[in-house]
Amino acid sequence: MTTVSMRDMLQAGVHFGHQTRYWNPKMKPFIFGARNGVHIINLEHTVPMFNEALAFISNVASKKGKVLFVGTKRAASEAIKESAISCDQYYVDHRWLGGMLTNWKTVRQSIKRLKDLESQSVDGTFDKLTKKEALMRTRELEKLEKSLGGIKNMGGLPDVIFVIGADHEHIAIKEANNLGIPVVAVVDTNSSPDGINYIVPGNDDAMRSIRLYTESVAAAAKAGRGQDLAVQAEQDGFVEAE
């Protein structure tokens, strides 16, 4: 089972919160104290809470569940994309479009358009168009890929969303809440933990911290998927008897 230790978190700087004047009082239970005007997060809480979240994600993946990684802040977007791809899951790393979950029907039509344009770009259709028309379609393709590329193969709503930066991604969290989709989120000292099923109190700005979260979630999803494949193989009679 994927777990993260206190040492891992200390080395990654997970305990450094925001300046005390920007704090959200709802995060008080998770704050150890302050140092040089910066809140220090109590990792005695974060370690078990994050490990509980990892166990939940692993369990979702073991049942063929879909995990959607969400992180559109500049510091998070690269790690979000790479980690999601590494475990064959899904991501939003550029901008959360309002209605991405709650208006899935419309999003699905945009994904269909994206896939149509992808086909046209490789089957020679673009070559038969005027330069201007080809350029317009190329730009449309690039725009759709940027917004929807990470969810184009999701095939339906996710079973859990994993969020870096609860404050920044409040629209995604609200949409998931409206649909009853569980939310795992990293919540810094300046953010509200409301609407989050699995709160991970921690630094949501430092790249080392972000990498620790995303890579751990990817490892948990992979481990869960591995359990699923092992069960499937057993059912198919591929596992030899002792």
Curated annotation (Swiss-Prot):
SUPFAM superfamilies: Ribosomal protein S2
Pfam families, per the entry: Ribosomal_S2
Domain of life: Bacteria
One GO term describing the cellular component: cytosolic small ribosomal subunit
GO molecular function terms noted in the UniProt entry: structural constituent of ribosome
Alphabetic keyword roster: Ribonucleoprotein, Ribosomal protein
GO BP terms in the entry: translation
CDD domains (UniProt xref): RPS2 (cd01425)
HAMAP family recorded: Ribosomal_uS2_B (MF_00291_B)
Protein family per UniProt: Belongs to the universal ribosomal protein uS2 family.
Protein name: Small ribosomal subunit protein uS2
Organism: Shewanella woodyi (strain ATCC 51908 / MS32)
